[in-house]
Structures are given as structure tokens and as C-alpha cells.
């Protein structure tokens, strides 16, 4: 079998069936995905990664995880953002954004020591990821001290409800403390009460700020959450 572009070929296997994201792969697709993993060292996302074990680690991402990260985000959108969270016509036409090259760069050369990309899963597989760093300049609240931000946290639909998201968030909070942040923020969609409930359970609270976002192809509002980090790990 000839694999001309391992990233594109693996993403084609992930996206070809549309939504809802399948929880099983055909034998032919599974063989192709495993071939890509063996030949190129590419980490596999679900459904090719199977289900996470109880001892799956949280680790710093490498370039080998980039395709899996892109795939997890695409699959999570299709599972979590239907039903009015985002417009169906946008979801029907969505692409891989950002591209795999973005995640390769993020893993290989972080913008600063205050940026970190984490994945949930042993080397060779990924079930979720978290991207973190300083608060984006457009989102800085001048009334607050310098803060860190969780830019993105996605867990694959197959792996949700198994504690990986909470562990990613806890690991990120420990790292934020280590690099000197006492306060962290993140955004959720106003139309996504499930995500808001998750963050509340992890100790995050709304700041009261609502930020309108217009990407041209889709517009929505984001709700800002924040949490103060104390030195005792709470």
C-alpha cells in the first residue's frame, strides 16, 4: 500500500464518514491507520486508538501527535456542537482547522516557555488534548493580574466521561502555577451548557464577560471563566 501523505490519508479516514463520528473503524481503515502509525510514527486518534485505559498518562505533545489532535477536534465538533450549539450548516461544511502544520509547530517550537500543549494518552495514541499559554491580547482584562489561558480543551467523543478532560485541566493548572501564574481563564460557547457545567465542577467560575466572535463563516458568543490558583495546589 502506498501512503503518499500520512497526515492527509489519516484525516481522510477520520472525516470520510461524517457525523456522528463513528466509534468503530472498518478492518480496511484500521489496517491503513496502523500502517501509517508504524511507518511514520503518527499517533492514532479514536476510533483507531480504541478506548483509553485507566492508566493513560497526561504528557507533553510531540509533533507525532499533531494529526491526532486535529482529528480529535474535528470529531468533538461533530459530536458536541450539534443541536443548536453551533449552526448545522457550518458544522456540515467544517474543515480541519487549524491545519496539522499548526499543531506540529506548536509541539516542536512553542511560542514561549509559557506555552504548553498536552495530550491524554500513551505515546502512539491520543484521546484528548489541551493547549495553554498567556491570555490572548484581545481577551486581556485590564482589571485583573496577568493571567494564563486554556485556549482549547477537547476530548474525543469515544473517550468522554472517563476523566481525561479533568486530568488534562488539573495538569495544566499545576503547570500554570510552576510558570508563575496565579490566575487562569478560558472561554466556552454561551450555547454550550454542558461545557459550562464541566468547568464549574472543576472549580472555575464565570467572570461575567461575554465576548462576541464573528469568523465570517460562523458567529457566536463566548463566556469567559476564570480560576485563581493558590500555592497549595487548590
Q: Residue spans of the language-model regions?
A:
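Residues within well-ordered alpha-helical secondary structure of globular protein domains
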Residues: 16, 72-75, 174, 201
Amino acid at each position: 500500500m502506498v501512503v503518499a501523505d500520512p497526515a492527509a490519508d489519516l484525516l481522510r479516514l477520520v472525516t470520510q464518514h461524517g457525523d456522528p463520528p463513528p466509534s468503530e473503524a472498518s478492518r480496511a481503515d484500521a489496517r491503513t491507520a496502523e500502517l501509517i502509525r508504524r511507518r511514520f510514527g503518527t499517533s492514532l486518534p479514536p476510533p483507531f486508538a480504541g478506548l483509553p485505559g485507566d492508566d493513560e498518562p497526561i504528557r507533553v505533545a510531540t509533533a507525532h501527535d499533531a494529526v491526532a489532535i486535529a482529528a480529535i477536534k474535528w470529531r468533538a465538533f461533530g459530536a458536541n456542537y450539534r443541536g443548536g450549539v453551533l449552526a448545522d450548516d457550518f458544522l456540515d461544511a467544517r474543515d480541519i482547522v487549524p491545519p496539522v502544520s499548526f499543531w506540529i509547530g506548536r509541539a516542536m517550537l512553542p511560542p514561549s516557555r509559557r506555552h504548553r500543549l498536552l495530550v491524554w494518552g500513551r505515546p502512539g495514541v491520543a484521546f484528548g488534548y489541551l493547549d495553554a499559554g498567556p491570555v490572548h491580547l484581545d481577551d486581556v482584562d485590564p482589571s485583573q493580574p496577568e493571567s494564563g489561558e486554556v485556549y482549547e480543551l477537547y476530548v474525543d467523543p469515544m473517550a468522554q466521561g472517563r476523566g481525561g478532560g479533568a486530568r488534562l485541566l488539573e495538569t495544566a493548572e499545576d503547570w500554570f502555577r510552576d510558570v508563575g501564574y496565579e490566575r487562569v481563564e478560558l472561554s466556552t460557547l454561551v450555547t454550550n451548557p454542558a461545557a459550562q457545567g464541566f468547568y464549574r465542577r472543576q472549580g472555575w467560575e464565570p467572570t461575567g464577560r461575554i465576548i462576541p466572535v464573528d469568523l465570517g463563516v460562523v458567529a457566536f458568543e463566548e463566556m469567559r471563566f476564570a480560576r485563581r490558583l493558590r500555592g497549595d495546589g487548590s
